[in-house]
Swiss-Prot record:
This is one of the proteins that bind and probably mediate the attachment of the 5S RNA into the large ribosomal subunit, where it forms part of the central protuberance. Belongs to the universal ribosomal protein uL18 family. This is Large ribosomal subunit protein uL18. Keywords: Ribonucleoprotein, Ribosomal protein, RNA-binding, rRNA-binding. One of its GO terms (molecular function) is structural constituent of ribosome. One of its GO terms (cellular component) is cytosolic large ribosomal subunit. GO terms for biological process: translation. The gene is rplR. Part of the 50S ribosomal subunit; part of the 5S rRNA/L5/L18/L25 subcomplex. Contacts the 5S and 23S rRNAs. PANTHER family: 39S RIBOSOMAL PROTEIN L18, MITOCHONDRIAL (PTHR12899), LARGE RIBOSOMAL SUBUNIT PROTEIN UL18M (PTHR12899:SF3).
């Protein structure tokens, strides 16, 4: 019997391969994206200190307004960019988390760029 491999296992392998070379610093934190079935989460992470600098998600009360999945991702991207700029971060490293740069991930990244983040 042929079994299909679990998509999340493949994504995690892909993410680990990318993470070997990708790292966030205090000057240029890593923007990590996680996509679940219901929500999308974004974190700015300083990997040297092991600290989350800022975060935003559709689980936040002010961002849980709704709309479509892509519209919600745009709101999260704008919110994480605003929070990053408020804390003094203009340039970041984008970590798509092993997901394809398409749909919700692309919408979040483009909204963050429109708000002024550079990556």
């Amino acid at each position: 019997m042929i079994t299909k491999p679990d998509k999340n296992v493949i994504r995690k392998k892909r993410h680990n391969r990318v993470r070997r070379t990708l790292s966030g610093t205090a000057e240029r934190p890593r923007l990590n994206v996680y996509r679940s079935n219901k929500n999308i989460y974004a974190q700015l992470i300083d990997d040297n200190a092991g600290v989350t600098v800022a975060s935003a998600s559709t689980a936040d009360k002010e961002l849980a307004i709704g709309g479509g999945n892509v519209e919600s991702a745009k709101q999260v991207g704008a919110a994480i960019a605003k929070r990053a700029i408020d804390k003094g971060y203009k340039s970041i490293v984008f970590d798509r988390g092993g997901y394809l740069y398409h749909g919700r991930i692309k919408a979040l990244a483009e909204a963050a760029r429109e708000e002024g983040l550079e990556f």
